[in-house]
């Protein structure tokens, strides 16, 4: 029977290889606990909930992933065509992709941006902004929040 004694550099390599393999298997089990998800905005199974009262009538939110009361939630946000979204801000930064419609967004101190389907926009945390969904609506946006989901009306925002 052949037996090799591992010492020095060979021992270090063997230990490091073992640790890397163990880490890979441990990481794989963590990632495997959560199933993958795909979702379309037209899915009739989506559960659309209400928006805060200062936002337009007919507005809706659908939670896609995560808990909106915790960090890292993803939502669809929907407003009817020809709706005005009054000035507001979010505690969290928001990453947005317009799914449908045409949305004109104005962040305080910045030029109005015209979002068309497929357009990505980034909104920094606490930066007030307003928007208008044009007649190509409804406007449906995918929004990824880093912090819990909220919308705080800016001073002077009218309640609808």
Regions found by a protein language model. Give the residues of each.
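Bacterial N-terminal signal peptides that target proteins for export
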Residues: 2-18
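A short, N-terminal "cap"/entry segment at the start of jelly-roll beta-barrel domains
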Residues: 24, 28-73, 156-160
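Extracellular/periplasmic catalytic domains that process cell-envelope and extracellular macromolecules
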Residues: 54-57, 68-70, 89-90, 97, ...
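N-terminal post-signal-peptidase region of extra-cytosolic proteins
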Residues: 60-64, 75-83, 100
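Conserved short histidine dyad/triad with adjacent acidic residue
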Residues: 73-90, 124-126
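Glycine- and acidic-residue-biased ligand/ion/polar-headgroup-sensing regions
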Residues: 80-83, 90-108
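Short acidic-glycine-tyrosine-enriched beta hairpin
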Residues: 109-126
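Ligand-binding loop in jelly-roll beta-barrel domains
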Residues: 125-149
